């Protein structure tokens, strides 16, 4: 096991969940725990959030759902976002997992197994409103509207869609997607809806519908957020929506001639701060006293400009610590910034502790890699990625410690 410790503060995650519940006054709030809870532990997070009355958990694959079901009672809903495939349909039924059906092929598969088992099977439908990554397209939705037998044997519980730019509060595409979604829902008046991811929650109540699906916000990503109590745009519509024939409505909906003027700061907005639940610490395992012009690490990419004290920490790119941190980035020792020097190798990194008091530099001294001084979002900005990737890349070798 690694000498590094990854601390996950479940209380912080629960606090973030409660904050999201407060914002979503008229909607339920689920939790996205795919990719092992963004690398932090899906089972532990789910068990903690159940205590906050969370009843809906979203995973990506059937395997993730099965692992989660082993620790959650059958009355808790587990949604599989990637849907159903022939090879795993029976497992979804066995473990009481609900697929999010993303195309007509998946609907046909789920209906086939409904007939095979002689029972009505639950499902969600995913409508593509503009992310264009997954989900039923307008032609497929039209087929469902015109032939309801395509859903025979299925218990359609929710219709969902996914925002493409929800973290950009002034992006007019959010409202374009919202209006597409609303038009589609007109044809399914008795079905509940889910639209808001983390960013969508902060766009305002119009985006909340019946169930919100936060992931990143639970884990403290994009932590300082402006929340709108209403839409973040002035709107002018020129749309002939009186004729709600399926083809006309669906085909025109994406281009309803919406003219949007972003309003920033948001009208009726307020600011909230999410808590970072993640701390990664690594001990100093070696110290080198080097003279001027000494080379450090592979390919001698860093050369000391003075007599230096260089410490070694036991983590590297095999643990998800990107090589892009080579000779850039920082760690913290007793709240003091310490630069990373030389190449990040598979299992080790070097830091320059020359400027620290000698009393703070010793074998076993802990350096904070991720924490309140250097959050996942800050780390991401240094290496040109996003906080999601930082968290989901956290290696399996870290000793995980859960704080309740």
UniProtKB/Swiss-Prot annotation:
Q: Name one GO biological process term.
A: D-alanine biosynthetic process
Q: Which residues bind substrate?
A: 133, 346
Question: Could you tell me which InterPro entries the record lists for this protein?
Answer: Ala_racemase, Ala_racemase/Decarboxylase_C, Ala_racemase_C, Ala_racemase_N, Ala_racemase_pyridoxalP-BS, PLP-binding_barrel, RPE1
The RPE1 insert domain sits at 226-273
* CDD domains the record matches: PLPDE_III_AR (cd00430)
Ranges that cross the membrane: none
- Pfam families tied to this protein: Ala_racemase_C (PF00842), Ala_racemase_N (PF01168)
What are its cofactors? pyridoxal 5'-phosphate
The pathway to which it is assigned is: Amino-acid biosynthesis; D-alanine biosynthesis; D-alanine from L-alanine: step 1/1
Record family assignment:
Belongs to the alanine racemase family.
What this protein is called in its record is: Alanine racemase
Species per Swiss-Prot/TrEMBL record: Rickettsia prowazekii (strain Madrid E)
| Source taxonomy | Bacteria, Pseudomonadati, Pseudomonadota, Alphaproteobacteria, Rickettsiales
Q: Which gene encodes it?
A: alr
């Amino acid at each position: 096991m690694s000498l590094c410790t990854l601390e996950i503060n479940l209380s912080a995650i629960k606090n973030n969940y409660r904050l999201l519940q407060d914002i979503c006054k008229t909607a339920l709030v689920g939790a996205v725990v795919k990719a092992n809870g963004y690398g932090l532990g899906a089972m532990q997070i789910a068990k903690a959030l159940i205590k906050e009355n969370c009843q809906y958990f979203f995973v990506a694959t059937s395997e993730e759902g099965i692992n989660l079901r082993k620790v959650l009672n059958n009355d808790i809903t587990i949604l599989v976002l990637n849907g159903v495939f022939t090879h795993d349909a029976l497992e979804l039924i066995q473990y009481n997992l609900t697929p999010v059906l993303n195309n007509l092929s998946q609907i046909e598969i789920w209906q086939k197994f409904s007939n095979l088992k002689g029972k009505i099977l639950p499902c969600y439908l995913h409508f593509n409103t503009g992310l264009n990554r997954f989900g039923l397209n307008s032609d497929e939705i039209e087929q469902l509207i015109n032939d309801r037998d395509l859903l025979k044997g299925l218990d359609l519980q929710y219709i969902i869609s996914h925002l493409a730019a929800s973290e950009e509060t002034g992006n007019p595409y959010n409202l374009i997607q919202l209006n597409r979604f609303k038009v589609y829902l007109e044809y399914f008046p008795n079905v509940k809806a889910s639209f808001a991811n983390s960013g969508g929650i902060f766009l305002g109540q119009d985006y909340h519908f019946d169930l919100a699906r936060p992931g990143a916000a639970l884990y403290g990503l994009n932590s300082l957020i402006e929340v709108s109590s209403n839409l973040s745009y002035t709107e002018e519509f020129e749309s002939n929506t009186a004729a709600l024939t399926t083809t006309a409505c669906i085909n025109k909906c994406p281009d309803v001639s919406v003219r949007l003027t972003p309003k920033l700061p948001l009208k009726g907005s307020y600011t909230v701060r999410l808590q970072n639940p993640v701390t990664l610490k690594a001990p100093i395992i070696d110290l080198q006293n080097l003279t001027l012009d000494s080379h450090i690490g592979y390919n001698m990419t860093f050369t000391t400009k003075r007599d230096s004290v260089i410490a070694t920490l036991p983590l590297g790119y095999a643990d998800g610590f990107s090589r892009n941190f080579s000779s850039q980035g920082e760690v913290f020792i007793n709240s003091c910034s310490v630069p990373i020097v030389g190449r990040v190798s598979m299992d080790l990194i070097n830091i320059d502790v020359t400027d620290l008091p000698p009393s703070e530099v010793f074998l076993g001294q802990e350096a904070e890699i991720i924490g309140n001084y250097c959050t996942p979002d800050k780390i991401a900005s240094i290496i040109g990625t996003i906080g999601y990737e930082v968290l989901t890349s956290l290696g399996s070798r870290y000793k995980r410690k859960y704080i309740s």
